[in-house]
Amino acid sequence: MSGNGVFRDPPGGRKAVAVWSIGVAVYFVAVIFRTSLGVAGLEAADRFHVNASALSTFSILQLLVYAGMQVPVGLMVDRLGTKKVLTLGAVLFTAGQIGFALSPSYGMALAARALLGCGDAMTFISVLRLGTRWFPARRGPLMAQLAGLVGMAGNLVSTLVLAPVLHGVGWVQAFAGSAVAGVVVLVPLVLFLKDHPEGHEPPVRAGGGGFVRRQIRDSWQEPGTRLGLWVHFTTQFPAMVFLLLWGMPFLVEDQGLARTTAAGLLTLVVASNMGFGLLYGQLIGRRQSARIPLALGTVGLTALLWAATLAHPGPHAPMWLLVTLCVVLGTCGPASMIGFDFARPANPPDRQGTASGITNMGGFLASMTTLLAIGLLLDATGDDYRIAFSSVFAVELLGLTQILRLRPRALARERTRLAAVRPPSTPSAPSAPSASAAAAASAAPADPADSPRPAPA
């Protein structure tokens, strides 16, 4: 922070990459643990002798804890800093994974997944905060997409590594062995991670109940924060539901695929996510006007492919259609990151954690709702996956309505803020103000590279 109270852009560089890499390594392990049930759903049903509704409760409880923790975690990150929150998160999700491995009963396994969800909830917002503290603001969209890409790599490990290990050595050895990764990432986290570069310390706000209420109120009042939440809500959940629990049973039990083939399709979703993550990050980093078209295009294409798959005549959809569906589901994760690209410019640096927490609730609330709906509908219809997965369309319609309602207000406010911080046009001032300075005044575009152009209409 400069002497006049304006935030300077962090320098980036090799040290920033090293510190950020420690944070995303923690997130990588958290995603492995989060998605491990997705490749063990059928085994979990056998181990704990539960039906589809009870099985979905594992993921629903985990997501309920995760979503409920987002605002408290955002406040903790704003108040305590990234290192303390990430360390606590790593301890909790490692303990949860060990507990899940050793649980002899359904109730104890539920408690372990709740503990895992609590620790998992502390990782992603912390990594986003690291990105904004260590890298220039123009890198914000790309760093967020890269963090999401690393998370999807964790999902890939669950599919390609944990699944065969589970089938080879058994439940306890597979889950307890994977928990070692949580211990491994704790070491560099405790020894080397720094919250911010020297000379870029955030302001210290007074704590207490007033701080909490003010942070939540001010973040929520911003249309950009609410638009970010609904973009995240609408775009993330189709892939999350598919990967977290119901994709494998759908492909094996409803579509008649072998487990190895189904695992390959789950891997395709992850690989597609990683590829589209880089593409979306580059597009949004260069032109913010791409945010809404990318988000709405992803929602529309996802709905179209699900409709084609579920409505296909005959007992099974053709393989080419399932492959296309999985490729399109891979765009959901990158599209959900667009939500943060609306919340980020709407809030100053000392409110980024809270605003990110509110935004991050969206997709997990939608996922939790859809996971429960699918489980209940499967039990009610005698495992009719076509009816059960139709619940996806109702949730997408709700989110789409809110995006269209909030879009004009959020973009109008963004234009107003951009105009307020744009310096007079003179030959000696060719560049736009830094996004960090604008954010300190609660008035910055997400990507200053777009500042000389009119904001999107």
Predicted stretch roles:
Residues 112-151:
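Cytoplasmic helix-loop-helix junction between adjacent transmembrane helices
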Residues 68-107:
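Conserved MFS/SLC helix-loop-helix module at the cytosolic interface between two early adjacent transmembrane helices
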Residues 37-38, 223-278, 370-371, 375:
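Extracytoplasmic gate region of multi-pass secondary transporters
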Residues 146-197:
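Helix-loop-helix hairpin linking two adjacent transmembrane segments in secondary transporters
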Residues 79-89, 285-300:
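Cytoplasmic membrane-interface "Motif A"-like loop-to-helix N-cap segments
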Residues 2-13, 196-229, 420-426:
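Juxtamembrane intracellular "pre-TM" segments in multi-pass secondary transporters
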Residues 49, 81, 102-108, 136, ...:
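Helix-breaking motifs and short loop linkers at transmembrane-helix boundaries and internal kinks
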Residues 69-81, 276-290:
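Helix-to-loop junctions at the C-terminal end of transmembrane segments
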